[in-house]
């Protein structure tokens, strides 16, 4: 099924945390998804940082139709089309590229573009986008910066990513406009490469316990 942006936001609010995943081997997505689901997370942002991304999205969609799937680190029109044809529910970009936003809108493909300053936010709002990624979160001022931006831009719904961990995730989630945080520390590539599903499961449980 296809979700509207608002439906995606509602699901993200329930989940609170989005695993940001980089894979070298697409086949690793299935045991990883099983591990995530068993520990309470039925969401994955699969990043286009490797050529395995589209195949991983395709495999996950075919085998775990219950998962909310984001295609992350999408930088080109070709990746947008590939993400959609592979079965992603929405696109996440590190920055705001109006051409990419317009393409997603033309394809009726929800997009959460990256912003970290007023200019990018105003471009997003002008294009009808109020659900945004705040990236790189900590390097861009973190919680303090988000609170400052929400003064004039109170309509934003935000998914911060970058530098978030157990030490600060609750500070982010305490802000009502934050729908979920993106994180990679509990799905590190080295843990996936070594098939260390037990450790990933432990780390997922750890973060779930923190954000309950």
From Swiss-Prot:
**Positions of the record's site feature: Plays a major role in determining the stereoselectivity:** 161
Q: Does the keyword Translocase apply?
A: no
Q: What class of enzyme is it?
A: lyase
Q: Which GO terms describe its cellular component?
A: cytoplasm
Provide the E.C. number(s) assigned to this enzyme.
Answer: 4.1.2.14
Q: Which InterPro entries match?
A: Aldlse_KDPG_KHG, Aldolase_TIM, KDPG/KHG_AS_1, KDPG/KHG_AS_2
One GO term in the molecular function aspect is: (4S)-4-hydroxy-2-oxoglutarate aldolase activity
What's an example Gene Ontology biological process for this entry? Entner-Doudoroff pathway through 6-phosphogluconate
- Give the residues the record marks as binding pyruvate: 49, 73, 133
Catalytic residues of the enzyme:
45, 133
What is the reaction catalyzed? Answer: 2-dehydro-3-deoxy-6-phospho-D-gluconate = D-glyceraldehyde 3-phosphate + pyruvate
Give the pathway annotation.
Carbohydrate acid metabolism; 2-dehydro-3-deoxy-D-gluconate degradation; D-glyceraldehyde 3-phosphate and pyruvate from 2-dehydro-3-deoxy-D-gluconate: step 2/2
In terms of CDD domains, this protein maps to:
KDPG_aldolase (cd00452)
Q: Where in the cell is it found?
A: Cytoplasm
**Keywords attached to this entry:** Carbohydrate metabolism, Cytoplasm, Lyase, Schiff base
Under Pfam families, the record lists:
Aldolase (PF01081)
Assembly, per entry: Homotrimer.
PANTHER family membership: 2-DEHYDRO-3-DEOXY-6-PHOSPHOGALACTONATE ALDOLASE-RELATED (PTHR30246:SF1), 2-KETO-3-DEOXY-6-PHOSPHOGLUCONATE ALDOLASE (PTHR30246)
- Role according to the record: Involved in the degradation of glucose via the Entner-Doudoroff pathway. Catalyzes the reversible, stereospecific retro-aldol cleavage of 2-keto-3-deoxy-6-phosphogluconate (KDPG) to pyruvate and D-glyceraldehyde-3-phosphate.
Family, similarity comment = Belongs to the KHG/KDPG aldolase family.
Q: What is this protein called?
A: 2-dehydro-3-deoxy-phosphogluconate aldolase
Q: Which organism is it from?
A: Haemophilus influenzae (strain ATCC 51907 / DSM 11121 / KW20 / Rd)
Q: Which gene encodes it?
A: eda
């Amino acid at each position: 099924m296809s979700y509207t942006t608002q439906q995606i936001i509602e699901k993200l609010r329930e989940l609170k945390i989005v695993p940001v995943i980089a894979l070298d081997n697409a086949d690793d997505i299935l045991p990883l998804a099983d591990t995530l689901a068993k520990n309470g997370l039925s969401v994955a942002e699969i990043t286009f940082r490797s050529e395995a991304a589209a195949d991983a999205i395709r495999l996950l969609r075919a085998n775990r139709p219950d998962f909310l799937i984001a295609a992350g680190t999408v930088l080109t029109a070709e990746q947008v089309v590939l993400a959609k044809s592979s079965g992603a529910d929405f696109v996440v970009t590190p920055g705001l590229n109006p051409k990419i936003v317009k393409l997603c809108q033309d394809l009726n493909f929800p997009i959460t573009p990256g912003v970290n300053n007023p200019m990018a936010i105003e471009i997003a709002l002008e294009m009808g986008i109020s659900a945004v990624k705040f990236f790189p979160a900590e390097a861009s001022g973190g919680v303090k910066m988000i609170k400052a931006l929400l003064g004039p831009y109170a309509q934003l719904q935000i998914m911060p990513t970058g530098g978030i961990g157990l030490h600060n995730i609750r500070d982010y989630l305490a802000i009502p406009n934050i729908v979920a945080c993106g994180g990679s520390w509990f799905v590190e590539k080295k843990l996936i490469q070594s098939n260390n599903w037990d450790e990933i499961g432990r780390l997922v449980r750890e973060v779930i316990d923190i954000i309950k």
